[in-house]
Amino acid sequence: MNEELAAYITHLCELSGHTTQIDDDVILVEPSKDLIYDAFTTRKDRYAYGHVERYSFGGAEFSSASFEIFKKFAIMHFAADI
């Protein structure tokens, strides 16, 4: 993940009140006390987005209201790669 993208995503997280930390190519996002999400990372030449342990595009956590900003950014980011 390039530094500019990492900084942008981290800034979006902070604006929405989330805590972030960068670990290698993974931006960990903590939206609440008990839940830690992986905002963006690369897995086998593709982008993954979702829960840090599943790297999935589905599930109840992915559709939560507090996570809408990340879904919208993911759509824009994927569209740029098409």
Regions found by a protein language model. Give the residues of each.
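Broad hydrophobic/π-residue packing in well-ordered secondary structure
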Residues: 6, 45-48, 63-64
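N-terminal "first-domain core" detector
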Residues: 1-42
